[in-house]
Amino acid sequence: MRRLRASSDGERGGIAVIVAFLMVMMLGFAALAIDAAKLYSERAQLQNGSDAAALMMAQKCAKNDTDTNCSTTSPLAADLANKNAIDGLSNVKSIALDKTNRTVTVTAGAKETGASANSVSLFFAGILGIPSAEVNASSSVRWGSPVEGTTIFPLAFSICQVSGMVDGAAQLLQNHSADANADCPLGPAGKTVPGGFAWTVQNSGQCGGLVNLAINQSGSDTGNDGPSNCDAVLNKWASELGAGRPVIVLLPVYDDATGTGSGASYHLTSFVAFSVQGWAFSGSDKLPMVYNASATSGLECKGNCRGIIGKFVKYVSLADGYKLGPVSPNGATVVEMTS
């Protein structure tokens, strides 16, 4: 009997169709992998650029809101966006600046020769009819002076020593109970304010404490041995200063004081930036409670002196954890990313 063989010619066309279909799928996956990687890289560069531009603008506005770079035509914004792109090309798509509410949002878009605005060309996806894709990144920043936050050190300065002294000369500031620093009539309704500084209440187990300018701050009594829980902070300050790096801290300012020690109450008005140079918070001559207390002529703090040496400065901080309000004339401002 003769065997009948089925012809395989009919299957050949089917296999070709399957291969063609698989090739299209492979091209699609290649488009997703390679082009997606390009889009991811481009967006990361744009995000860095928009972050840098927004932070720069907020810092400029915090220092001086009439600065040319505190405007929607900021020339430095475009420069920073370009410098954060690998090819040196980007486009500042928009700048939304609100000086009243102290916010700025910078949106950066891609820029590529031959591609449409804010877009990059795609290689594999182009084969599938998608020649380019738009890539943008936005960054929002706000600025202002602190009105609430946790301080790094439990100390508040008198308005007497701050007024007119931001970016001024270094001072030796002592506890107001020592009457070493001049009082002044800068309190509410011209009330006399004790000069120097005051010790404030610390958070449990911490060196600093929560400060809210809307609420009077209670005082504390550290005795002759300085504040507790502050060894690590003071040792770090000494290490930074010894290495030639500045130590600038944000601390509150009071314009009224009643009582003394742990029974005192202080009316706080603002935060100020203080550049620390030395201190003597106990009668010893060793760290952490004493550092560089006799290095500057005329500002020595020896014997019974309990004080801190340094100067008030205009300073923009990137520290987080503060609630912000309008910019204070006392020079301390904070800039923070919001998105």
Describe these PLM feature segments.
Residues 66-75, 93-118, 125-339:
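N-linked glycosylation sequons
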Residues 82-92:
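Short secondary-structure junctions
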Residues 17-19, 24, 31, 91, ...:
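Sparse, context-dependent recognition of short Cys/His-centered cofactor- or disulfide-binding micro-motifs
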Residues 1-77, 166-167:
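Alpha-helical assembly-interface signal, strongest on the long, hydrophobic N-terminal helix that forms
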Residues 56, 60, 83-84, 142, ...:
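Conserved, well-folded catalytic cores of nucleic-acid-processing
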Residues 38, 119-120:
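Short, glycine/acidic-rich beta->alpha junctions
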